[in-house]
Amino acid sequence: MPARSEPYRPDASIVAELAAGAVLLHDPSGDCLLLHQRDEDRWCFAKGHVDPGESLAVAAVREIREETGFEDVRLGPELTEVSYRFYRPKTSENVYKTTVFFLAFTRERSTHAEMIFDRAQWFDLASARVRVKYPTDRRVIDAALRHRSSLGPTEDRA
């Protein structure tokens, strides 16, 4: 995980990063899993860097498994793409990061979150939208709400 970020600096060099993640829904309840990142005191989705040669879909599933401990992960449709920039003091460079988010499903409930998270909790999507810190994360949840309503009842996805 990158060190705590600072505002973008116009005088620093820039690198591009690609990440993949997901809004993970519990099947059949439809609750959304959020992970609480202790060092930044914020709720977030499972997501992370795409490894060389890895597809976005494979990266999203891998990140969910690594960050939650879940094995039963079924990837749904791509939801949206979010891009933002920030300054990383550790490397003295700006980062332009793009994260592609998917909708994903699991029947598992009990997580074994990575050490960078102090807790994981299930929320209905409306409550999750209130808990996330950034407007971009709210847009991701909005996309999940739109896609979920187009899928119909949970039983239809089996």
Language-model features and meaning:
Residues 149-158:
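Short, charged, intrinsically disordered terminal tails
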Residues 101-103, 111-144:
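NUDIX/MutT-family hydrolases
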Residues 44, 96, 122:
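Short aromatic/basic micro-patch
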Residues 1-22:
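Acidic, metal-coordinating catalytic segment for phosphate/diphosphate chemistry
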Residues 30-71:
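Conserved Nudix-box catalytic region and its N-terminal flanking loop in Nudix hydrolases
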Residues 69-109:
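Active-site segment of metal-dependent pyrophosphate-handling enzymes
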Residues 14-18, 26, 94-96:
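A short catalytic or substrate-binding loop motif that flags glycine-/basic-rich loops and adjacent residues
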